[in-house]
């Protein structure tokens, strides 16, 4: 049996990773998604075990210490990580996995899975990214300022990735991702 492939989707907060991921999973039912663990509070509409596994800081530290996480990172005062077992099991069973993770985690994955396809999603411009963050209506002015500062740093790392895509249109970006995934999974 052929082993599955690992695909990493990264980019600044507000660039559209979640929307793209949701559409990709709908279009590619054979693609598996790893549900991340986080210490942040659930946002409206998020479902435990589907959107994230929500844990407290002590539980997250225990997961790090017992090496239950493939990668983990801190973002905006909260921790995020990818449970190791589901990723390994799916890949061994021949299913390709997609991870939506932060830059720090993507760098960790590169060391563990050097053959992973790493895709960086870029905004059309910083002004557009700022507009998207405000449009979500879920962050304070201070939080948005921090996210934009971090986005500037993250954008500098885009060239570390195998592929960089500007998300100026969800449909155009999805078409590009479809082509990329088709060739990568062959």
Curated annotation (Swiss-Prot):
Pfam family, one: Guanylate_kin
EC number: 2.7.4.8
InterPro entries for this protein: GK/Ca_channel_bsu, Guanylate_kin-like_dom, Guanylate_kinase, Guanylate_kinase_CS, P-loop_NTPase
The reaction(s) this protein catalyses: GMP + ATP = GDP + ADP
Keyword Hydrolase: no
All copies of domain Guanylate kinase-like, residue ranges: 4-182
Subcellular location as annotated: Cytoplasm
Gene Ontology molecular-function annotations: ATP binding; guanylate kinase activity
Residues involved in ATP binding: 11-18
CDD domains assigned to the protein according to its UniProt record, in alphabetical order: GMPK
Keywords linked to the UniProt accession: ATP-binding, Cytoplasm, Kinase, Nucleotide-binding, Transferase
Broad enzyme group: transferase
Any one Gene Ontology cellular component term annotated for this protein: cytosol
Functional note: Essential for recycling GMP and indirectly, cGMP.
Family: Belongs to the guanylate kinase family.
Record-given protein name: Guanylate kinase
Lineage of the species this protein comes from: Bacteria, Bacillati, Cyanobacteriota, Cyanophyceae, Oscillatoriophycideae
């Amino acid at each position: 049996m052929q082993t599955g492939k690992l695909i990493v989707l990264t980019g600044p907060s507000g660039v559209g990773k979640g929307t793209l991921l949701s559409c990709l999973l709908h279009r590619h039912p054979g693609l598996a998604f790893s549900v991340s663990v986080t210490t942040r509070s659930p946002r409206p509409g998020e479902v435990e075990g589907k959107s994230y596994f929500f844990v407290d800081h002590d539980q997250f530290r225990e997961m790090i210490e017992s090496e239950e996480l493939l990668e983990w990172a801190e973002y905006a005062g909260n921790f995020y990580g990818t449970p190791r077992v589901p990723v390994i099991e799916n890949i061994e069973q021949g299913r390709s996995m997609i991870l939506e993770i932060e830059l720090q985690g993507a760098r960790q994955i590169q060391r563990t899975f050097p053959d992973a396809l790493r895709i960086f999603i870029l905004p059309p411009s910083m002004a557009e990214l700022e507009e998207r963050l405000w449009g979500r209506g879920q962050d304070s002015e201070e939080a948005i300022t921090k996210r934009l500062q971090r986005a500037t740093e993250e954008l500098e790392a885009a060239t570390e990735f195998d592929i960089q895509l500007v998300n100026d249109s969800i449909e155009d970006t999805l078409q590009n991702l479809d082509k990329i995934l088709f060739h990568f999974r062959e």
